[in-house]
Regions:
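Rossmann-fold NAD(P)-binding glycine/threonine-rich loop
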Residues: 1-39
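General beta-strand structural signal in soluble alpha/beta enzymes
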Residues: 2, 42-44, 104
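Short catalytic/ligand-binding loop motif for oxyanion handling, primarily in non-cytosolic enzymes
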Residues: 8-9, 51-52, 113
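Alpha-helix capping and helix-loop boundary segments enriched in small/acidic/polar residues
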Residues: 14-18, 48, 291
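Flexible glycine/proline-enriched surface loops and loop-helix/loop-strand junctions
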Residues: 38-43, 178-182
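Domain-scale recognition of functional cores that engage charged ligands
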Residues: 46-55
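Alpha-helical scaffold elements adjacent to nucleotide-binding pockets in ATP/GTP-utilizing enzyme cores
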Residues: 56-60
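C-terminal catalytic/substrate-binding lobe primarily of soluble NAD(P)-dependent oxidoreductases
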Residues: 63-381
Length: 381
C-alpha cells in the first residue's frame, strides 16, 4: 500500500489523492479485474496496527456482548445479540451494542537513558515510517452518527464505499482526546489502513444498499516523550526532517506500550482491549528490542502462521482472517490481553480553563458525547 516516493508533488496533490483510501480502492479494483481471488495467499498490512487491532476489535465486541448478556443489560436485543455472536457477525454486533466510535488508542511511555539531542528524531520504531504517516493528511473512517464535519474535511465521491474522510492537515497536527488503561491521553490521528478496512467490514447495509450503520474509526497515537519532542522540533523545522535519527532499543530503561482498541458508545460507555507490554516483559520475550517492535513482530508472526496454513486464499486484509487463530498465534509476544470497561467519555474529565469565553459551547455536544467535535483538541472553531 505504500509508495516509493510519497513526498512527490505534496503541495500540488489534493489531500484525497494522498489517502490510503485511494490506495485500498486501487487494490480492490485490481482484484476485481482478476475476476477471482483464489490465487496465492497474501495479507495486506498486518503488523500490530494495522493488523492485530482488527482481531482485538472482534475480541472486544465478543467481550462486550457477553457482558451485556451476563449482566442482563441486553434487554430486547438479547436474542439478536446471541444470534449475531454465534454467527460471528461483528458488524451486527457493533450496531446492536451501540458502538459509535473506535479508537486505536495507544500510549508509549518508554524512556531512554540517552536523551534526545537537538536536531535528532527519536522513536521506538521506524523514524521514516512515522514521518511518512505523520505528514500525510489525517484520515479516518467516518461514522453514520456524526452530525458535524470540520471545515477542512474532504469526503470521497468515487464508486467505492466512501466510508472515510480526510482532513487537509497533517496527522501529526491532528489531536484527539482518548483513553488507555493508564488514563486519559491525547493522540494524533495518524493515517492507518485499519481506518478503511475496519470501517468497511463493520458497516451494516440497508436493503437499498445504503449504509444503515458505520462507526467512526481512527488511530489516536501518543508516542514516547522523545518522539513527541521530535515531532515538535520537526514542526519548528517546517516539516524538514532532522539530519539525525535514532531508534530506541537497548537504551530504554523503563515504560510500556499500551496498544489496543477503545470501543465507545455502548452500554458500558467505553471498553479497551489490547496489549500493555512493558519493556521488561518485551526483553524477556525477545532481547534487544522495544515493547513496540515486539508487539509488531508478534503480530507479523500471527499473519505468517495463517499464510503457512492457508496458502491459496488470495489477497486478504486483516479483517478477513480467522481472528481467534491469528490472535492466539500472536499472544506469546504481546503479553496478557487487557479487556475491560471504562466509564470514560471525551467530556468526563474535560477541563476548559476559559469556559464560556471560547468556542467550547458552540460545538461541544453534551447530548451525544461521541460526536467528533467532542474529541478534537483543541475544540475547533
Amino acid at each position: 500500500v505504500e509508495l516509493w516516493d510519497p513526498y512527490d508533488d505534496m503541495a500540488s496533490t489534493h489531500p484525497l489523492d494522498r489517502t490510503l483510501y485511494v490506495r485500498h480502492q486501487a487494490i480492490r479494483k485490481m482484484i476485481e479485474r482478476w475476476g477471482t481471488n483464489n490465487g496465492a495467499s497474501a495479507v495486506v498490512e498486518h503488523g500490530a496496527n494495522p493488523g492485530m487491532v482488527s482481531h482485538l476489535v472482534k475480541q472486544a465486541l465478543t467481550d462486550i456482548t457477553t457482558q451485556l448478556l451476563t449482566d442482563g443489560k441486553a434487554g430486547s436485543r438479547a436474542s439478536s445479540l446471541q444470534t449475531a455472536l454465534e454467527a460471528q457477525q461483528f458488524n451486527v454486533l457493533a450496531q446492536l451494542t451501540g458502538t459509535k466510535v473506535i479508537h486505536i488508542a495507544e500510549r508509549d511511555t518508554q524512556v531512554s537513558s540517552k536523551p534526545k539531542l537537538t536536531n535528532e528524531f527519536c522513536n521506538t520504531w521506524s523514524v521514516e515510517g512515522f514521518y511518512e504517516e505523520g505528514v500525510a493528511p489525517a484520515e479516518l473512517g467516518w461514522g453514520t452518527h456524526e452530525k458535524w464535519m470540520p471545515a477542512n474535511a474532504h469526503a470521497h465521491t468515487d464508486d467505492g464505499p466512501r466510508n472515510q474522510i480526510c482532513l487537509a492537515q497533517p496527522g501529526m497536527e491532528s489531536w484527539v482526546r482518548s483513553w488507555v488503561p493508564s488514563g486519559d491521553t491525547l493522540g494524533m490521528i495518524i493515517r492507518h489502513g485499519e481506518s478503511y478496512t475496519m470501517t468497511h467490514h463493520l458497516t451494516v447495509k440497508n436493503t437499498d444498499g445504503t449504509d444503515a450503520y458505520r462507526p467512526t474509526v481512527h488511530y489516536a497515537y501518543h508516542p514516547s516523550d522523545a518522539a513527541i519532542n521530535s515531532v515538535l522540533e520537526l514542526r519548528m523545522r517546517n516539516w524538514q526532517m532532522q539530519p539525525k535519527e535514532r531508534i530506541f532499543n537497548d537504551e530504554i530503561i523503563d515504560g510500556r506500550d499500551e496498544l489496543g482498541v477503545l470501543l465507545m458508545g455502548h452500554d458500558y460507555k467505553s471498553w479497551w482491549t489490547g496489549s500493555t507490554l512493558s519493556i521488561h516483559e518485551a526483553r524477556a520475550i525477545i532481547p534487544n528490542q522495544s515493547a513496540t517492535t515486539v508487539q509488531v513482530a508478534g503480530s507479523v508472526v500471527g499473519a505468517i502462521t495463517w499464510l503457512l496454513d492457508c496458502p491459496s486464499e488470495g489477497v486478504r486484509v486483516p479483517d478477513e482472517l480467522p481472528w481467534k487463530k491469528v490472535l492466539d498465534a500472536t499472544r506469546p509476544y504481546i503479553g496478557p490481553i487487557h479487556s475491560a470497561p471504562s466509564d470514560w467519555t471525551p467530556l468526563k474529565n474535560r477541563n476548559d480553563l476559559f469556559p464560556g469565553y471560547g468556542n467550547d459551547t458552540s460545538l461541544l455536544d453534551h447530548s451525544d458525547p461521541w460526536q467528533f467535535a467532542n474529541f478534537l483538541a483543541p475544540t475547533p472553531y
